[in-house]
């Protein structure tokens, strides 16, 4: 869905155009931005800049705070891990937002993910499943982050452990994630995450430095 922002001169701008000018701080545009946040949740899209603009408007206009939109922005920022979007969003929260019980729950979930305690995360996620039921693709976005961590941590991993880390998924779903990440079955209940040839290899880099680039520096040393 396309969201247009109505300017005082009667013209319309896209949200991206509005965010590039001083109009991003105009509270008259807050309702449009909040609707845009809801569309991101519904359609599994993501716009960090717009979401941070909403939180900034809440800072300037605390009386306009919508706590449900705050939840959605924080949860959407979790779906972008391992990027630091959640930290940026958290830094813009008002004291009244930080005191909210659901906000604290989301912060706890973020801490658990950052510690890579995925088994605990899925347990807490199940208890609080109603909180992000409206976020399309939330679970798969977290599984994508889990896959990233697994790929950078393991060479081989037990199939049963991998299923647990991905949220206790079914075998058929596990197969799709194995295929998606380019992993391979090794037998004996093991999954190969990284082949020996995929290990980081050292590389010699030769840089040619011209005399003109260092002549001035050498002259100063004389």
UniProtKB/Swiss-Prot annotation:
Q: Which Pfam families match?
A: CSN8_PSD8_EIF3K (PF10075)
| Cystines in this chain | none
One Gene Ontology term of the biological-process aspect is:
regulation of translational initiation
Q: Do the record's keywords include Cytoplasm?
A: yes
Q: What is its main location?
A: cytoplasm
Q: Which InterPro entries match?
A: ARM-type_fold, CSN8_PSD8_EIF3K, eIF3k, PCI_dom, Transl_init_fac_sub12_N_euk, WH-like_DNA-bd_sf, WH_DNA-bd_sf
The record's Gene Ontology cellular component field reads: eukaryotic 43S preinitiation complex; eukaryotic 48S preinitiation complex; eukaryotic translation initiation factor 3 complex
Q: A Gene Ontology MF term for this entry?
A: ribosome binding
Subcellular location per UniProt equals: Cytoplasm
Quaternary arrangement and interactors, per the entry?
A: Component of the eukaryotic translation initiation factor 3 (eIF-3) complex. The eIF-3 complex interacts with pix.
Family per record: Belongs to the eIF-3 subunit K family.
Name of this chain's protein: Eukaryotic translation initiation factor 3 subunit K
What organism does the record attribute this protein to? Drosophila erecta
């Amino acid at each position: 869905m396309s969201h247009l922002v109505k300017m005082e001169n009667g013209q319309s701008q896209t949200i991206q155009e509005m965010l590039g000018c001083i109009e991003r701080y105009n509270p008259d545009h807050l309702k449009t931005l909040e609707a845009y946040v809801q569309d991101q949740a519904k359609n599994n899209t993501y716009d960090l800049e717009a979401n941070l603009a909403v939180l900034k408007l809440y800072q300037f206009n605390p009386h306009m705070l919508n706590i449900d939109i705050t939840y959605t922005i924080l949860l959407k920022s979790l779906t972008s891990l391992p990027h630091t979007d959640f930290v940026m969003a958290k830094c813009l929260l008002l004291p009244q937002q930080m005191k909210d019980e659901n906000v604290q729950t989301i912060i706890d979930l973020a801490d658990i993910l950052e510690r890579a305690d995925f088994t605990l995360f899925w347990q807490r996620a199940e208890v609080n499943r109603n909180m992000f039921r409206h976020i399309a693709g939330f679970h798969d976005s977290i599984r994508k982050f889990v896959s990233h961590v697994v790929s950078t941590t393991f060479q081989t991993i037990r199939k049963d452990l991998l299923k647990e880390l991905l949220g206790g998924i079914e075998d058929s779903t596990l197969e799709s994630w194995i295929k998606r990440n380019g992993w391979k079955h090794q037998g004996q209940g093991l999954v190969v995450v990284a082949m020996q040839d995929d290990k980081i290899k050292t590389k010699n880099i030769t840089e040619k430095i011209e005399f003109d680039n260092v002549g001035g520096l050498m002259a100063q040393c004389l």
